Amino acid sequence: MDSDQTPLINPSLFEECAQNHFAAADSRSRRPFHIEPSYITSINDDEPQRITSEASAMNKRIHYYSKLSYPSGGGLIAPDHVLPAPEEIYVYSPLGTALKIDGSDGSEKNSSIVTIFMIWNTMMGTSILSIPWGIKQAGFTTGVCVLFLMGILTLYCCYRVVKSRGTIPLTDTSTWEFPDVCQYYFGSFGRWSSLLFSMVSLIGAMIVYWVLMSNFLFNTGKFIYNYVNDVNITDDVLSNNGTDKVICPNPDSTGPLNKSMDTYYGNGTNLEHFETWWSKTNTVPFYLVVLLLPLLGFRSPSFFAKFNILGTVSIIYLVSLVTLKAAHLGFHLQFSWNQVQTFFVPEFRVSFPQLTGILTLAFFIHNCIITLLKNNRNQKNNVRDLSIAYLLVGLTYVYVGVVVFASFPSPPLSKQCIEQNFLDNFPSSDILAFVARIFLLFQMMTVYPLLGYLVRVQLLGHIFGDIYPSIFHVLALNIAVVGVGVIMARFYPNIGGIIRFSGAACGLAFVFVYPSLIHMISLHRRGQLRIHSILIHVSIIVLGISNLIAQFFM
């Protein structure tokens, strides 16, 4: 009797058969192996399951179709209405077992290398433009140390997110995301609070994108106008001497000024007219509305998703640009802990929380890491692949931040001149910077509708249960999101400030608080919670709260 209850399909043979089975080009050739999922006694990913007599009857019924034939000799197949959905396919053995197989498993699983690259590509975003400024705010030595420490801390919290589903007993969590785990532990509060902080991260990213797109579009238009009209420029701003010019747009201010500081020689009337209608903060943010607002109304983001490769190209180009500029400019460093510096900054500065806020968003992937790891071919390698991806992201940030900071020409310029967007330290006439801005502008214009789609899915889906309740709901949401971006680009175009506030806010929940609380609650329910674990995870929560509070005093 015991042998009668054991699985009758060898797992290794089953995997080989299933791979060939689902690789068939004609899905109809697989139809005799479909049965209704409701007839499966239980679902378990680890081993085949015994099936009921109803499932056996269904199998015989489908085989019956294959026994019938046309008068001409052609065999019949089961009609479409008999078959389950593709995502509910079970492979059945007449000997009495059945296994559920996702049709995509055999062909769309990713190797570890692809998974690592996907995580790296997802995390690399606009924060990289502000890393050199963040290091300047923290001090060089402190900034590099904070980079490594924040990378380790966010990696550990991300590891806790990955393991969070496994802490829930007697429940199939294979399709759950982290907000579902939060709802399980914290009820409706967990659901709505996770939605709130997710909105903060998404809308914060959309605001940063709008500010940067306004910046890039302004400088691109300025470069084209000067080139077409043969306008000669003499910079009144502080700059170094040499072919690779680096400028200090705001020598007496930590934030960007809303005016041009260049002297032009050409047709003065046309130039004044151009400057009136082509202003970084007064006009260009409004021009973007005409370009981007219609794109937010698309029902599906699949078209824009095809351009994701541009993000990788942009990052590779930025790294190449930084390397080339550093090779020409050389390194300019002076290590000193003295607070009074003319051209350099001390190694430690009390404004270092500005960097921690930026890095919280720079290393933020906690709300979607479960989704990215689901398609990893070998689930046992999830933690290893996640760690490698974080290492690569951290090294990329360190490389760009350190090289830009170290190569900034001091003297004659002060390190205080490093801008929140380090591309602003290159004049609009710089061809290499012009190409970088073009790359980033086009990439952001394709990613922005994707972010808007995610906002629509999460917000309207939670409130109305439909991601497209009506064109009026969608239009009102899009106008509100775009309006916030325009207002910030007009009155507060400081991407460093926006990134650090949104990063500290969304990171408070998804990075610091929820993963730590869930881990402690699960240990407590199993009777395994110890004092050292409490101290460690409470300290992480306190760090997250302190990180957010500190942003208001910087």
From Swiss-Prot:
Motif (CARC motif): 437-447
Residues on Lumenal side: 134-139, 219-276, 328-349, 409-430, 494-500
Membrane topology per record: Multi-pass membrane protein
Disulfide bond positions: C248-C417
InterPro entries from the UniProt entry: AA_transpt_TM
Residue positions of motif CRAC motif: 450-456
Posttranslational mods: Glycosylated.
Region called Important for arginine binding and amino acid transport, residue ranges: 122-127
Pfam assignment, any one: Aa_trans
Segments crossing the lipid bilayer: 113-133, 140-160, 192-218, 277-293, 303-327, 350-370, 388-408, 431-451, 473-493, 501-521, 534-554
GO (cellular component) term, any one: late endosome membrane
List of glycosylated residues: N232, N241, N258, N267
Residues where arginine binds: S127
A GO biological-process term: positive regulation of TORC1 signaling
Similarity field: Belongs to the amino acid/polyamine transporter 2 family. SLC38A9 subfamily.
Biological function: Lysosomal amino acid transporter involved in the activation of mTORC1 in response to amino acid levels. Probably acts as an amino acid sensor of the Rag GTPases and Ragulator complexes, 2 complexes involved in amino acid sensing and activation of mTORC1, a signaling complex promoting cell growth in response to growth factors, energy levels, and amino acids. Following activation by amino acids, the Ragulator and Rag GTPases function as a scaffold recruiting mTORC1 to lysosomes where it is in turn activated.
Protein name: Neutral amino acid transporter 9
Lineage of origin: Eukaryota, Metazoa, Chordata, Craniata, Vertebrata
